[in-house]
Regions:
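A residue-level marker of the well-folded mature domains of exported/periplasmic proteins
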Residues: 13, 18-25, 44-313
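Sec-dependent N-terminal signal peptides
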Residues: 24-34
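Basic, mixed-charge low-complexity alpha-helical segments
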Residues: 35-36, 46
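C-terminal motif of bacterial Sec signal peptides marking the signal peptidase cleavage site
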Residues: 39-42
Length: 313
């Protein structure tokens, strides 16, 4: 690798790490808003203020790497907050296993168990009605996070909140990294036609975040002066194993015409890398792969020059 190439990877790595630090701030903000909401709702400033808070959390899939890392950060933050305030923070975490009906039952159980606040990483962002109705009936605040519900639903009751990154920002930064890579590394233009031929590994069919991330990633590349051509796409449901299968199918269909893999999250980007490794191609023959989330494993893949970048979520 020439000196210029080494510098490019070092600079991109630094940029990625800066963006990851920003995502850590989002997690801390989530914890701060969560604890503050509970304090305002039930503990703040009264002589009879409770000395403990019970928080129920339901995640759409505990095996999603980003969600798993976010929950670890949140628990670490809660421990720190306990030490600062002297208020015991008890957290019960549930895995909805990608089932909205399961998640609805979990929320009902949280209410029965006496949770002071409920946090929900929605399975189906278009179907929060049962959760909202249960919470409103029992006057328990709900903080939705990471998977944004429809705005009209969020406005149904004053004790509903949402915390999460803006999907378009992640898409813009992903597009910036991809454009920078293409414009500074001629080897990525494998057929030499001056066009970045790409495929997309999309999170979920019709999911707002997936659609917005892809749209802004592509439009940002174009705005940066990169001519692009979409070869194909596949739905991989944010899942690494599904992404490996879908990437293998895309490779079978488009072969070495693929110059860029745009993945809506790091797990799917890593699934694409798994498929590339299984294909027997050398790294020099791989298309560029880029993700979103800034997960630990995603950053490790950037460090190992398997991914050209990842951005915060």
């Amino acid at each position: 690798m020439c000196g210029a190439e080494k510098v490019r990877h070092m600079l991109m790595g630094e940029q990625v790490l800066k963006k990851w630090k920003k995502s850590k701030k989002m997690t801390v903000a989530f914890g701060g808003i969560l604890v503050m909401s509970v304090v305002i709702g039930g503990c703040g400033g009264r002589e009879d203020a409770k000395k403990s808070i019970k928080i129920g959390i339901s995640v759409y899939d505990q095996y999603d790497t980003f969600v798993s890392e976010m929950m670890k950060d949140f628990n670490d933050y809660a421990t720190k907050k306990e030490e600062e305030t002297g208020v015991a923070i008890n957290i019960d975490t549930y895995n909805a296993s990608a089932s909205q009906s399961t998640q609805n039952s979990q929320v009902e159980n949280m209410i029965t168990e006496g949770c002071d606040v409920i946090c929900v990483n929605l399975v189906d962002r278009t179907d929060p009605t049962a959760i909202i109705d249960l919470a409103e009936k029992n006057n328990i605040p709900v903080i939705f996070f990471n998977r944004e519900l429809v705005e009209e639903d969020l406005e149904r009751w004053t004790r509903l909140y949402y915390v999460g990154a803006q999907a378009f920002e992640s898409g813009i930064m992903q597009g910036e990294l991809a454009a920078e890579a293409f414009l500074t590394d001629q080897s990525l233009d494998k057929n030499g036609d001056g066009i970045f031929q790409y495929v997309v590994l999309e999170g979920e069919a019709g999911h707002q975040d997936a659609i917005v991330r892809t749209e802004y990633s592509v439009s940002t590349m174009i705005d940066s002066g990169v001519e692009v051509e979409k070869l194909g796409y596949a739905i991989a449901n944010w899942n690494r194993a599904q992404a490996q299968t879908k990437m293998a199918q895309l490779m079978s269909q488009f072969g070495d015409s693929i110059e860029l893999v745009i993945a809506n999250n790091d797990d799917m980007a890593l699934g694409a890398i798994d498929a590339l490794k299984a294909s027997g191609l050398t790294k020099d023959e791989w298309p560029a792969v880029i993700g979103i989330d800034g997960t630990d494993v995603g950053l490790e893949a950037v460090k190992n020059k398997e991914m050209i970048g990842t951005v915060y979520n």
